[in-house]
Each structure stands twice: as structure tokens, then as C-alpha cells.
């Protein structure tokens, strides 16, 4: 009887009218045929939105209906299949309703007492070769990166089973979901099985397959309670296992285009548990061609008072992998080039954080040297301790003048804009500079740097076989005037051995210096420099100076210089340039002493 043309026409009219009435819009169906086992096949379906734009088109749809309900003038759909469907959805702005909202509103029961002619309970949905387009028309478009405000999904295929769907339970199985998105996303297959009620939810499995990615999640379970029809978040607990899987980063270039060159896979597995406000990572393992990570950690109070801790059992990075990451991600994530010069990296330690505070403590081993680190970062402040048995500073800085560096240092400081302030204290056991190894240097100072200007206030001590230096004081060029207050004691100082000068070979110097000067430049400097017990020892020479005092000032607006020393005294008053002062004095003396004049002229001629 169902194949009688009059009956088919009646069924078609009932179905079309029921859909139009339920959705409240124009619905077109080109042809309706009956299939096997109560199936109705609809060809050429078009559903319009309320602006009379095509919302959904499908070359063919197959639905399974309840014949008994149909004979009573109702349409009850238990399963559906869509072939070649295209959904064109959009909204004008983020605050306007989408053009499909009326469909959702029509399916929602606003008047429970009113009986609908259409009962849609789709237990099985199959989609083949579908397309989904969505645009938020006021939002800018992007190319090559996923944009949830502009979606263009093609090759959409799905097989979804809704075994149970009631007010208090759900039994859902996605046997397969595959799609492509214009951003470059390719989902080969997603399968999952989920059961849920008002007390617990169980995720039997979730499998995701992409061209080079295979993710396997299992044994997910969550327990919770409802109060006044609302989920009581404090009652939520959950756990989940990510079985051994692998990820090819370039598969996720639709999220971060910089991942496109990363074609080698990374093996990953983890196990987590938690509550509505906490997360515990029982284990996390990552393994790739240039990286290995074994770690665990916790997070809690992430809603308003985030705290986290992590323990890194092993972090290993190969040099070629680091170089590859810097080449492809360096600019986006501001990775310094110095990282690439460390070579292979191995780290073991702990990290924890609270709000903007981050702390790191552990042992770092690299091809450029090893170090023990303890670092705290708080907003724009930092505090840390470093112990190193030897770091190739020249290799890291790419500066041939530097070599190895061995030290124990504490630092406390801040940065704000282009200003850096540091208080440093510690011992530098050795420091290679200009092909010489300095030993036994201690530092206790406060340093502030802004662009090319700097303040220094503190102590510097060096007890090296070729020089003993004790420096205490301050200097600054950050104000309008250069200012320096320094006291220095120097003993057995050998410039040649330190690779600083070769003018006086094998000479050793000693002296005491007390300086207090300020000025815009050398010619306007005011203050004094005192040198005591200056001593020079050389194989064939010995020179000693008890004292030398140089004072610069002004008298009635005129610059004055006063020099007092063992070998004589000098007073200068007037305008002069330090760069030419020595030659000027020599020429004055030469005019009074002819022999000196001849010697000076001969010297200038030789030059």
C-alpha cells in the first residue's frame, strides 16, 4: 500500500508540511520515494533561513519514520542520512543571532502542553561528503590559520549513534568523523564512545587520527552531583589516560603556522586526575628525534589563585633540534640566539608558580658547560643563584675575547622598559678574557643600566697572581654630570701578563688611588685624584712616587688645575683642552730651554 502513488503523495505532503510548520520557514523537496524498512528518501532538499537565503541544501536525505505515528498525522524520525549536504550559516556581528537560531528555537519545546506533529529523535545520523560554511561578517578573515569566526569545512563525513538521549542520561557513539578545513586542518578520523548520567560520565575511548598524528585516550571517568538542576562544581572529580600516542606538530599548523616545518613525530603519553579546581599530571612522557621529557606536576585554584608545581625528571634537547626550533620559532617566541650555542642540553629540577611568580631550581648540563640554578621571577623582578664549574662564555656570546667562566653568584634585580637594575654578590673563581685567565674575583655591587648609561656602586676585589686589585666606590653617567667616587688599592699588577699592554714588558705596578670627580666631560671635570705609593718594578728599572694630587676647580668662573707631587708642583688657570695640554706645556718649556726646544722639534720631525 505504501507504494501506491496516492499514498506516496500523501506521505510527501505530510512530511513537507510538518517540516515547514515545525521550522517556520520555507522548505522545498523535489522528490520523495519510499525505501526499505520504513525509510523515506528525499531528493533535492532546500531549507531557507528567515532572510530567504539557502540555509541547507542536500542532494539526498534518507530518514526512517515510525509508520504508526505517520498514520496518525505525525512524523517521528529515528535515523537520518544526508548526502552532499551544504550548510550556509552566518551572523552579522558577535552579538546578533545566527541565521540558524530559528531552527534551534523551533526544535526547543516552548509550550510543553502543545503537541507537535514532528518528533525528531535521531538515533543514528550519517553524513557523506558534507560542507559547512560559517561567517561572522564583521570579523576579519585569516589565511592559513584556524579562525572560528570564518569556517569552511569540506569532505565532512560522519556516523553518529545516539543510543540514549534523555533529560538525565546520554549514550553517544561516534563511529567516525572526518573533515577538512580551509585553514589546512585534516581530520582523517575521530571515534569516541561516551556514557553520562546525573552522577557520572564515562569516556570509554577517544581516538583522533590525522595525517601524521595518532591520539589514543581511554578510561576517562568523571563523578559529580547536580543541585537545583545545576552541576555542583565542587563535587567534580575526574581522571583520564592518554595511552602511548604520537603527534606530528605540522598537523597542527592550522593553529600555529610556525609548526609547518616540524614534520618529525613526537611520542607522548600521560595520565591525569583532578577536580573542578585542580589538576594532577601523574606522568608525562615526550620523546622525539631531538627531545625527551619525563615530568609530573600539579595545578590548583586556577579560577582565582593559580598555583602550580612541576618536577622534571629528565629534559634532554639535542643541539640540532634547538637550532631548528630557533630557526622556525625564534622570532615568534623571542628565543635568544645564545640558546643555540649551548649545544646539547640536559636539565633536571623543579618549577613552581603562583600568580606571576615563577621559581626554577635544578641542574643544567650543556656542551658549553654545567651550572646549578635557582631562579625566581616575580612580575618585573628576579632573584637567583648560580653555581658553575665552568661555562664557555666565549662560545655562548660568540665573542673570541671571552673564554671559560667559573663562579658562584647571587643576583637580585628588576627590569622596567629599557632600565635594568641588578644587585650582584659572589665569587668568580676564574674568568678568561683576552687570552688570560683571571682568578679569585669577588663582587658585591649594585648596577643600574639604562640604554648606554649606567650606575655602579659597590666593591670589586681581584686576587690574581698577576694583579691584586681592591676597588670600592661608585660612578654614574645617568645624570647631567658624570660622577665618580672611587678608592682603589693595586699591588703586583702586571699589564703584560694580563694581556692589557705590552709597552713595559715584565713590569709590576702598585698604588693607592682616591678619586672624587664630576663633570660633563674631561675638560669640565671638577674634583680631585690622589695617588699614593705608586711603585713600578721592572728588570732594569725601579720607580717610586710617594704622592701625587691633582685637583680641578674654578675660581671666579675660570677653570683651575693644581698638581702636587714628589717631582714638583703646578698651577694652571684659564681655558684649555686636556687633549693638547701636554704638548702645550712642552712647547712653553721649549721656548725657555733651547736644548729642550731642539729635542722637541727633532722628536716631532721623527714622528
What does each model-found stretch correspond to?
Residues 1-23, 86:
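N-terminal type II signal-anchor transmembrane helix
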Residues 21-44:
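Short extracytoplasmic
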Residues 23-25, 44-169, 174-179, 185-189, ...:
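Secondary-structure transition motifs
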Residues 44, 65-67, 84, 91, ...:
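Residues on the solvent-exposed faces and adjacent turns
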Residues 51-65, 139-157, 182-193, 199, ...:
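Amphipathic hydrophobic-ligand
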Residues 88-90, 133-135, 178-180, 246-250, ...:
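Gram-negative outer-membrane beta-barrel proteins
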Residues 174-177, 201-207, 278-286, 355-365, ...:
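Transmembrane beta-strand segments that form the barrel wall of outer-membrane beta-barrel proteins
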Amino acid at each position: 500500500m505504501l507504494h501506491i502513488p496516492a499514498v506516496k503523495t500523501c506521505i510527501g505532503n505530510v512530511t513537507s508540511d510538518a517540516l515547514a510548520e515545525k521550522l517556520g520557514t520555507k522548505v522545498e523537496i523535489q522528490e520523495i520515494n519510499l525505501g526499505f524498512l520504513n525509510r523515506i528518501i528525499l531528493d533535492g532538499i532546500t531549507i531557507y533561513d528567515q532572510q530567504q537565503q539557502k540555509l541547507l541544501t542536500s542532494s539526498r536525505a534518507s530518514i526512517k519514520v515510525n509508520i504508526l505515528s505517520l498514520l496518525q498525522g505525525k512524523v517521528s524520525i529515528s535515523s537520518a542520512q544526508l548526502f552532499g549536504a551544504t550548510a550556509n550559516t552566518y551572523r552579522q556581528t558577535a552579538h546578533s543571532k545566527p541565521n540558524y537560531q530559528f531552527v534551534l528555537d523551533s526544535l526547543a519545546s516552548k509550550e510543553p502542553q502543545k503537541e507537535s506533529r514532528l518528533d525528531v529523535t535521531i538515533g543514528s545520523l550519517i553524513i557523506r561528503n558534507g560542507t559547512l560554511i560559517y561567517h561572522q561578517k564583521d570579523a576579519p578573515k585569516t589565511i592559513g590559520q584556524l579562525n572560528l569566526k570564518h569556517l569552511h569545512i569540506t569532505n565532512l563525513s560522519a556516523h553518529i549513534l545516539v543510543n540514549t538521549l534523555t533529560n538525565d542520561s546520554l549514550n553517544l557513539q561516534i563511529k567516525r568523523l572526518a573533515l577538512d578545513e580551509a585553514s589546512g586542518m585534516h581530520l582523517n578520523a575521530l571515534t569516541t564512545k561516551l556514557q553520562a548520567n546525573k552522577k557520572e560520565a564515562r569516556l570509554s575511548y577517544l581516538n583522533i587520527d590525522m595525517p601524521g598524528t595518532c591520539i589514543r585516550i581511554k578510561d576517562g571517568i568523571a563523578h559529580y552531583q547536580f543541585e537545583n538542576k545545576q552541576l555542583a562544581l565542587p563535587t567534580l572529580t575526574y581522571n583520564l589516560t592518554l595511552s602511548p600516542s604520537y603527534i606530528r606538530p605540522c598537523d597542527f599548523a592550522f593553529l600555529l603556522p610556525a609548526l609547518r616545518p616540524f614534520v618529525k613525530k613526537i611520542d607522548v603519553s600521560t595520565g591525569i586526575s583532578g577536580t573542578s579546581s585542580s589538576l594532577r599530571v601523574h606522568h608525562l612522557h615526550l620523546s622525539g628525534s631531538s627531545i625527551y621529557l619525563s615530568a609530573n606536576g600539579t595545578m590548583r585554584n586556577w579560577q582565582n589563585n593559580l598555583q602550580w608545581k612541576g618536577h622534571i625528571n629528565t629534559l634532554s634537547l639535542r643541539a640540532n633540534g634547538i637550532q631548528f626550533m630557533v630557526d622556525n620559532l625564534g622570532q615568534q617566541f623571542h628565543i635568544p640566539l645564545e640558546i643555540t650555542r649551548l649545544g646539547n642540553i640536559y636539565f633536571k629540577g623543579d618549577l613552581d608558580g603562583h600568580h606571576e611568580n615563577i621559581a626554577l631550581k635544578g641542574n643544567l648540563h650543556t656542551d658549553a658547560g654545567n651550572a646549578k640554578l635557582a631562579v625566581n621571577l616575580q612580575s618585573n623582578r628576579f632573584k637567583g643563584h648560580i653555581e658553575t664549574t665552568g661555562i664557555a662564555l666565549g662560545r655562548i656570546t660568540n665573542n673570541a675575547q671571552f673564554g671559560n667562566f667559573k663562579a658562584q653568584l647571587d643576583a637580585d634585580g628588576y627590569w622596567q622598559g629599557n632600565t635594568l637594575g641588578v644587585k650582584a654578590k659572589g665569587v668568580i673563581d676564574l674568568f678568561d678574557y683576552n687570552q688570560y685567565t683571571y682568578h679569585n674575583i669577588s663582587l658585591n655591587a649594585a648596577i643600574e643600566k639604562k640604554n648606554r648609561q649606567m650606575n655602579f656602586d659597590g666593591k670589586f676585589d681581584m686576587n690574581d697572581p698577576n694583579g691584586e686589585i681592591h676597588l670600592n666606590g661608585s660612578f654614574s653617567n645617568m645624570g647631567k654630570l658624570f660622577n665618580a667616587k672611587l678608592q682603589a688599592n693595586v699591588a703586583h699588577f702586571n699589564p703584560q701578563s694580563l694581556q692589557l699592554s705590552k709597552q713595559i714588558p715584565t713590569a709590576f705596578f702598585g698604588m693607592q688611588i682616591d678619586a672624587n670627580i664630576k663633570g660633563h666631560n674631561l675638560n669640565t671635570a671638577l674634583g680631585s685624584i690622589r695617588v699614593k705609593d705608586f711603585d713600578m718594578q721592572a728588570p732594569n728599572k725601579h720607580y717610586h712616587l710617594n704622592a701625587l694630587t691633582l685637583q680641578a676647580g674654578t675660581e671666579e668662573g675660570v677653570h683651575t688645575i693644581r698638581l702636587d707631587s714628589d717631582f714638583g708642583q703646578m698651577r694652571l688657570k684659564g681655558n684649555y683642552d686636556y687633549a693638547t695640554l701636554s704638548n702645550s706645556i712642552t712647547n712653553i718649556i721649549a721656548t725657555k730651554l733651547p736644548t729642550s726646544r731642539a729635542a722637541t722639534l727633532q722628536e716631532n720631525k721623527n714622528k
